[in-house]
Amino acid sequence: MNERLQYSHLMNYITKHNRKLSKTYTWNDDSQRVSATGFSNQRLRWSNKTSICLILSTLDNKFIACSRKHSFLYSEIVRCRSVFRKKRLFLTYTRFLKKKERPFLSSKLNVPLDDPGTEHNDIIFPGGLPKNEEDPIMCLSREIKEEINIDSKDIYIDSRFFVHLFIEDLLSNRVYETILFLGNTTLTSNEILNNFLANREIKSLVFLDALEKGLMCDVLRYVLAISQLKCFGSTGDKTELLYDKVTESEKKMAPRYGFD
């Protein structure tokens, strides 16, 4: 494992206070390397820099993923302050940008672009960063409603375990941490598509099959395998309505933040 990953305070805490369910598995593609470790959910810790995400299965046995409105590389180039680094990322990794992003950045950076190339899409599982007053369950409920327009009353979550991910962006050389849960919805993929509204983060939905190839499906299969294990010592349950979990979390957080 990359030396930088060994100094994660979050991972050190999780390993100390939660029973590990498997060894760490690592997969990679041209743009990222992902290391996954499953834990029994005994004493979860999180921060507002750690993404909380959900692998969500539909009533017709598909798994929901999201196609980002902007590529990760575009977001990195826009955020970066160094003009030299902006140009280097653009020239070196142009194919990891969306087609419409390439001419825009070419003009913005004053760098010629001869061939717009093929389309590129970054696919993610729904979720995001928790706000200061949120725990992971509250974060999931809000993010899933915002991103894919599914209400917490239509989602059941398996809170017996969670999977910790190290995501190494091989283009920007950044490392991100994610806590991943598993759940299911009472809606079909067609119902979800009909209710979905494109937003500032998500362009469209993608429905995955567990047998497909690719890094996302490697992670998906790992999480499904972990869900078959006995999560001894866990404080969670195999099937809990997300709405009820959120209500429970809000009551626990109320004294801390002074909610009414």
UniProtKB/Swiss-Prot annotation:
The active site is at 143 (nucleophile). Mn(2+) binds at residue 147. Residues 46-230 form the Nudix hydrolase domain. Signal peptide: none annotated. Induction: Expressed in the late phase of the viral replicative cycle. Mg(2+) binds at residues 134, 169. Its cofactor is Mg(2+); Mn(2+). Its EC number is 3.1.3.-. GO terms for molecular function: metal ion binding; phosphatase activity. A motif (Nudix box) lies at residues 128-149. It is an enzyme of class 3 (hydrolase). Keywords: Hydrolase, Magnesium, Manganese, Metal-binding. The keyword Metal-binding applies. The keyword Magnesium applies. Belongs to the Nudix hydrolase family. Decapping enzyme required for the removal of the 5'-end m7GpppN cap tethered to viral and host mRNAs to allow their decay in cells. May therefore accelerate viral and cellular mRNA turnover to eliminate competing host mRNAs and allow stage-specific synthesis of viral proteins. Acceleration of the turnover of cellular transcripts may even promote the shutoff of host protein synthesis. This is mRNA-decapping protein D10.
